[in-house]
Amino acid sequence: MTAPLTLALSKGRIFEETLPLLAAAGVQVAEDPETSRKLILPTTDPNLRVIIVRASDVPTYVEYGAADFGVAGKDVLVEHGGSGLYQPIDLNIARCRMSVAVPAGFDYANAVRQGARLRVATKYVETAREHFAAKGVHVDLIKLYGSMELAPLVGLADAIVDLVSSGGTLKANNLVEVEEIMAISSRLVVNQAALKLKRAALKPILDAFERASQNGG
């Protein structure tokens, strides 16, 4: 008996916005990860299961073959490097942007012009390093895993690099967006060996995902 395909997803927005794509492939997830304690979820297709992992771990599970394919944000893939992954489809879901934000009243442009060395808090250290290096901005990067908006408020950092959707959280914490680094959406990533060895099983799902993403879900 052939082992079922394994799809790696993270809880939250990516999971919710992937459900219509699965539905387009005729598949429904049998349990809700927000209420279930299970990390391996069955689907209505006996040949497909879903594993729930941290968003930042999706590329690793797919790269090493623990999952055949997965859905990951561009932010995660850029930081990971994307080695060993086939990225056939931009699913156009979980859209947002990665930006630099500073406290309201902080003259970021002037600080950059004067060559000031800035402390920047982010969980996207590699992406931030490349961005600031390309612009010739001197920074000390501080890696945090959450609550980025707090860092400038307590004097830990001059600026943050984080994901922004509506900007409401920034505004609530008296921060302003000063620079967009890149637009973010979620991509389908496929293990390269699985693409060769399990192509017959994968192709109908990948095709359905592509059609649904082009049609807006």
UniProtKB/Swiss-Prot annotation:
It catalyses: 1-(5-phospho-beta-D-ribosyl)-ATP + diphosphate = 5-phospho-alpha-D-ribose 1-diphosphate + ATP. Pathway: Amino-acid biosynthesis; L-histidine biosynthesis; L-histidine from 5-phospho-alpha-D-ribose 1-diphosphate: step 1/9. The keyword ATP-binding applies. One of its GO terms (biological process) is L-histidine biosynthetic process. The keyword Transport does not apply. SUPFAM superfamilies: Periplasmic binding protein-like II. It is found in: Cytoplasm. Keywords: Amino-acid biosynthesis, ATP-binding, Cytoplasm, Glycosyltransferase, Histidine biosynthesis, Nucleotide-binding, Transferase. GO terms for cellular component: cytoplasm. InterPro entries: ATP_PRibTrfase_cat (IPR013820), ATP_PRibTrfase_CS (IPR018198), ATP_PRibTrfase_HisG (IPR001348), ATP_PRibTrfase_HisG_short (IPR024893). GO terms for molecular function: ATP binding; ATP phosphoribosyltransferase activity. Its EC number is 2.4.2.17. Heteromultimer composed of HisG and HisZ subunits. Catalyzes the condensation of ATP and 5-phosphoribose 1-diphosphate to form N'-(5'-phosphoribosyl)-ATP (PR-ATP). Has a crucial role in the pathway because the rate of histidine biosynthesis seems to be controlled primarily by regulation of HisG enzymatic activity. HAMAP family: HisG_Short. Belongs to the ATP phosphoribosyltransferase family. Short subfamily. Lacks the C-terminal regulatory region which is replaced by HisZ. This is ATP phosphoribosyltransferase. It comes from Burkholderia cenocepacia (strain HI2424). The gene is hisG.
